[in-house]
Curated annotation (Swiss-Prot):
Cell location: Cell inner membrane
Organism: Brucella suis biovar 1 (strain 1330)
UniProt GO cellular component terms: plasma membrane
GO MF term (any one): transmembrane transporter activity
Family: Belongs to the binding-protein-dependent transport system permease family. CysTW subfamily.
Gene responsible for this protein: thiP
Quaternary data: The complex is composed of two ATP-binding proteins (ThiQ), two transmembrane proteins (ThiP) and a solute-binding protein (ThiB).
Domain ABC transmembrane type-1: 62-266, 339-530
Protein name listed in UniProt: Thiamine transport system permease protein ThiP
Keyword Transport: yes
Transmembrane segments: 19-39, 64-84, 102-122, 142-162, 205-225, 250-270, 300-320, 343-363, 379-399, 406-426, 468-488, 510-530
Membrane topology recorded in Swiss-Prot or TrEMBL: Multi-pass membrane protein
Amino acid sequence: MTATPARRTSLASPATKPVAGGLALAFLATLAGGALLALALEAGGGGFDAAANFDTYLWRVARFTIWQAVASSLRSVLFAIPIARALYAEARFPGRGLILRLFALPLALPALVAVLGVTSIYGRNGLIAHISDMLGHPMQPDIYGIAGILIAHIFFNMPLAVRLLLAAYESIPDDYWKLAAQLGMGSRARFRLIEWPVIRRSLPGMIGLVFMLCVTSFTTVLTLGGGPRATTLEVAIYQSLHFDFDPARAVALTFTQLALTLLILLILRLTGRPSEEGFTQTATPRRYGSPRKTERLFNIIVITLGFLYVALPIAGVVVSGLTADLVRLLSERIVWHAIATSLALGFSAALLAVFLSLALVAAREATRNARIANIFDTGASLILVMPPIVIGAGWFILLRHFTDPFVMAPLMVVTVNAAMAMPFAVRLLRPAWDTAASRHNKLCSQLGIKGFNRLRLIDWPSIRRPCGMAFAFAMALSLGDLGTIALFGSDALVTLPYLLLQRMGSYRTFDAAGLALILGVLCLALMMIADRAAASRKEAFLQ
């Protein structure tokens, strides 16, 4: 009796799984390709002269986009180096694990919420202004413009750089620290001979990653830019469609943004991407010998300053939100409508992202052709080449020729947010799926267990927690998204971030603070669910 081929894994038959993966790739290709096609057609016809819009305004916006990203990324990494060095040296520092968990929050918070936290500290009515008044030296710091953009970008990206640098420090062999202690090396010698070579190898990819995040930072620049002099390409795209309705200019800006993004990704691919492999939140004392008192004092000061820089805006969100009239806010029908809309769109986007990611992961594992498997493996990540505002702009221009774009708003928000979450979902699902396949493929083949029965009985127990993690993470990303809804939002489709932006625009700051707290709590709750699921999965694996 001939055994069933080992290729028969889960979800469906071996022939169906690559088809499902192909459909997932087709979804991404349609989403990105449709936007590009619309932009190309708009540039080449319809009476629009897109080439004429490659003018001094566009190049000024492009220069500012690059300049603010360079300034933000260099400052973020420059500040991260001493903080990461101090955190690694003080492995037994009280609250070290708490600080590292705190450093994971900025990227988990919706950008709009974090921006309000930054303004609560550095704004004209912020904490620093109040302290200066109390000291008799009143000052009104101007948070809007390049200063505010830099402060916010450092808040987002410095903690990320610290975590990546700590991962690099973890790769230093124990023997290096032993030898340094035996030779009596001082702090400068250790940094120059042991630490700097490791940091230097990580810098190109790290700076490139932070630069990419700053170039595609839409919400931060939209809220803190303060005017035409501090406008990036993505904000200019939004303004050209939402306020001026100038499709030709939007096309020129979008192609410039796309070219810049592709260039950055090419540089990242050549320099290599930083990894958090080996990173831990627990104390890992690998250094030998006791640091000098002056060195330890310096480390404590640096850690404290880094902690305050990240903690104060987060505390500002909580304090400002609690001072708002939450009872009145929660009694407004529009607020509950926005919450329900956000949850419904977020749930739909997360479900779609997990389903399509599973299709890609299953197709990759079932495919024996290495080249095709690599396409399934990297296909989801390619969507990151196009920022959400670019995809939204392309489809907005395309849909207006056939229907009212705002009628299609829910579908566009769900599909774009699902696509943007897929690279992260694939990364969470792939290890568990591959492990389950390697363990069970042969036995299931011999027993003839396949299709839905295998998924239900064999594979689902192994991938249930990763699916929960991916779902919670994707839903949190969708809840805090402003890029797509900023273009397609209207009175008929109001999400929590869109309502928050409206309240900020009408200078209802207390309402905005309350909404920011609600949005932040929702997103952080989902992130905590994902984190708990990850921890439970790790414990189960160790057992």
